[in-house]
Amino acid sequence: MRKIYIHICAVLLGLAVISCNHTNQRQQTGNSGTAISKKALKDSTVVKQTVNTAAQVYAKPEVPVLCYHRISDGPKSEYRVSPETFSAHMKILADSGYHSILPDQLYDYLFYNKTLPEKPVMITFDDSRAEHAEIAAPVMEKHGFRGVFFIMTITYNKKNYMTTDQIAQLEKAGHTIGLHSWDHTMVTKYKEEADWQKQVADPKKKLEGIVGKAVEYWAYPNGVYDHNGAEELSKYFKLSFSLYSKRDSAVPLQSVRRMIVPECTSQGLLKSMHRTFGR
């Protein structure tokens, strides 16, 4: 009887040891799983993108930004180049190794330090003239260039100006559509909330309906920069473009400088770019 009792105790002790070992194994497995899970979480953590301060944006080398207005034959003017001259300008840019960039690329370069192609240049157009779609765009596309077209929404579907279909087609072809106000009223005259609604908020919404995407870039009417206006524009746009005005170190993203391109030779264009932007 005593032998049977001892045997039963031994069996029970063995079962207890097995149970403890199994529990420890489960705990170890669980701890290991937790450790793996934490490691995986750590490895999958997205590193936040570094952004530049206003001072850092202001310190970055400028990119040449060209601005064309009318592309037609007629009296010589700072705001007009002939179709032949425009074609020659695009050819010399291509032959000289320039690469056209769009505002998204410029913004990423200024704000996030993204790399730009060698010899970047931005080609922009103000006032939504019909010849921008009918003459300029095909010439640029022939050289692999894309441009930026700033639209006054009061003009579309009117004589000598782009139609809504042309605006949408430019966007589909890889160009960028920006806003140039409703009726070309200068930002310095936006005094009331109603002015901002009429010249910026409402036209922006209408233009977005035409192109089917956000409109994130602005060109100052008449190229006239305004510091107070720039602060307000930063609520609507990533970048705003002026003409010749000095950049504002407080809001450099809203004071991107452009150069008006007049009737001039191809070599004259390159010299003006170098003189204005240093490249």
Regions found by a protein language model. Give the residues of each.
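Bacterial N-terminal signal peptides that target proteins for export
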Residues: 1-8
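C-terminal motif of bacterial Sec signal peptides marking the signal peptidase cleavage site
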Residues: 16-19
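C-terminal active-site subregion of NodB/CE4 polysaccharide deacetylases
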Residues: 24-124, 129-131, 184, 188-279
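Acidic (Asp/Glu)-rich catalytic clusters
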Residues: 58, 137-145, 162-180, 234, ...
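Short, well-structured secondary-structure segments
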Residues: 64-67, 99-103, 122, 141, ...
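Secondary-structure boundary/capping motif
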Residues: 131-132, 158-159
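Short, well-ordered secondary-structure micro-motifs
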Residues: 159-161, 189-190
